[in-house]
Design a protein with these regions (language model features):
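A residue-level marker of the well-folded mature domains of exported/periplasmic proteins
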Residues: 1-255
Length: 255
């Protein structure tokens, strides 16, 4: 039977080292971690950033940049700091966490079922969305509104998510529709972020925030165009565990 096969497989593998990387096992709807998978045995590791920790860092960096550059960031002077958000995969726990992290830091998040809603808003130029709310930032006695103008899952027609080409098309549409209302571009990863950066925000001087440490994003940071990235790796941990060596220092036990 299927259950018998699963039991036999689990029995055969129960003592083998297990390394999770890039994505923490989680519920695709809520982002809640699968602690059974993360504690499969004593040699189970996750290599990478804690999804929530990295997400909070990205959100904090966006907020700090806005605050530090408040005199110049409002491109049309309307008192609203507008941002657009490229969402990688609405069912991926890293994407969920990164979207929540940005919204939490900027005060645009709305709680749904005990957590900040991570769904895309579509278009929200008038601030009427129920998925997000307008945030506010007070700098030097002046209060500015922060608004998520638009966000969408970057899924192409073949069903691939985290799609850079789709993000490039999205920024073309958004910039044509919103123009100088867009003050900040934020992405769940560098691939989508760089597509938007190269497609529009670089030429406009609009700050772009990504996540991953892709080589082209690192180069763009050096040139002063992209302002945030985070990177991870798993190979050393897996190799050392297979050779019965000490695990890679980047591995994290979350249980």
């Amino acid at each position: 039977s299927t259950s018998g096969s699963n039991a036999a497989t689990e029995g055969a593998n129960k003592d083998k080292p297990l390394v999770w990387f890039n994505r923490q096992p989680s519920n695709s709807s809520t982002g809640e971690l699968d602690m059974n998978a993360l504690s499969f045995n004593d040699n189970t590791y996750y290599v990478g950033f804690d999804a929530n920790q990295g997400a909070e860092l990205q959100g904090e960096m966006v907020l700090k940049y806005i605050t530090d550059n408040i005199d110049t960031i409002d491109r049309n002077g309307d008192g609203i700091i507008g941002y657009v958000l490229a969402i990688g995969d609405i069912g991926h726990n890293d994407s969920i966490a990164r979207t929540r992290g940005v919204r939490s830091a900027l005060g645009t998040g709305v709680e749904a079922n005990g957590a900040i809603d991570s769904n895309p808003v579509g278009t929200n130029t008038d601030g009427s969305s129920t998925i997000v709310q307008d945030g506010s930032i007070d700098v030097g006695g002046t209060t500015y509104t922060v608004r998520e103008l638009a966000s969408q899952e970057m899924k192409n027609s073949a069903g691939a998510t985290w799609d850079a080409a789709t993000a490039g098309n999205a920024i073309t549409t958004w910039s044509a529709s919103f123009g100088d209302q867009i003050d900040v571009v934020v992405s769940n990863n560098d691939g989508m972020g760089m597509a938007m950066f190269n497609g529009w925000s670089q030429a406009q001087g609009v700050p772009t925030f990504g996540y991953d440490a892709n080589s082209d994003a690192v180069a763009a940071i050096a040139n002063g165009g992209v302002y945030n990235h985070v990177g991870i790796a798993a190979l050393d941990c897996l190799r050392n565990l297979c050779r019965s060596h000490v695990r890679y220092n980047g591995a994290v036990k979350l249980f």
